[in-house]
């Protein structure tokens, strides 16, 4: 439990973070963590500040430490997965995103990112299997249809792939007389 003074500092740091004054927020969060080194909200928000400043290694360390203290924090799991994804570290992102989906399986955005990581790593069979399952849960998801369609093209299943790409992007096949783009 934190005292009133620390709570006041935390709110000050949050104000800096929201106003994109990340260096100031970092200073305050670090001061809080000197007194309360195992305070997940301070670690998590410090990681967000580092991420915004493109200090990826520092952000990663904060998220990992946060998860060591509170392993069930789905927000920290998702943000660590997002950090890896946004920095092109798809192999590192996959197990983190998988952990997130085990914690809560109906996260549509996490499912999209997981599918894209599989796609970027050219894991065609895994993309195929994963997207089939995901599209049963989210049949209108255009991003999943796009990854699945592109993956089907990679697998030389061109007709099926084109069908999913048409559904997801509104592409028009040559030779169609009537077409509609939503």
Question: What do these predicted ranges mean?
Answer:
Residues 31-32, 65-66, 99-100, 133-134, ...:
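Canonical positions in the second alpha-helix
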Residues 18-19, 52-53, 86-87, 120, ...:
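Register position in tetratricopeptide repeats
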Residues 5-35, 41, 48-52:
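Alpha-helical segment of the N-proximal tetratricopeptide repeat
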Residues 35, 69, 103, 137-138, ...:
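Structural marker of alpha-solenoid helical repeat scaffolds
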């Amino acid at each position: 439990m934190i005292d009133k003074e620390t709570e006041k500092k935390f709110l000050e740091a949050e104000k800096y973070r929201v106003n994109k004054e990340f260096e100031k927020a970092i200073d305050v969060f670090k001061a809080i963590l000197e007194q309360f080194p195992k305070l997940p909200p301070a670690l998590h928000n410090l990681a967000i500040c580092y991420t915004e400043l493109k200090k990826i290694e520092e952000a990663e360390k904060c998220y990992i430490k946060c998860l060591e203290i509170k392993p069930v924090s789905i927000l920290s799991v998702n943000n660590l997965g997002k950090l890896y994804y946004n920095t092109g570290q798809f192999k590192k992102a996959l197990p983190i995103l998988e952990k997130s989906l085990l914690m809560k399986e109906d996260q549509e955005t996490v499912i999209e990112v997981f599918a894209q990581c599989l796609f970027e790593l050219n894991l065609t069979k895994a993309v195929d299997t994963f997207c089939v399952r995901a599209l049963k849960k989210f049949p209108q998801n255009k991003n999943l249809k796009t990854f699945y369609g592109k993956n089907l093209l990679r697998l030389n299943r061109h007709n099926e792939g084109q069908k999913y790409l048409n559904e997801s992007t509104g592409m028009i096949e040559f030779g169609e007389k009537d077409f509609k783009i939503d």
